[in-house]
């Protein structure tokens, strides 16, 4: 099973916080920063899955998974645009959905 180093976990958390800072603004930015700061100690080390056979089921796997999903979502959107698809959502909406697709 893949394992992340402490540095990778910290780097991933910092990338996630930078993504939030660069994507959102206003009240949404403030609320997201408040939520993620409050849960940092748990979210930064949480696995993406509790089952060892599933994706990113290691310490720090949740944040790594979220970063992969947001990156893939943006790449797929770009492919759709290049194919002439009508895009009726913003990058902010796409990233918000990608970041939180596993919550709740």
Predicted regions and their residues:
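Acidic/His-rich, divalent-metal-binding segments that scaffold phosphate/diphosphate chemistry
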Residues: 1-104
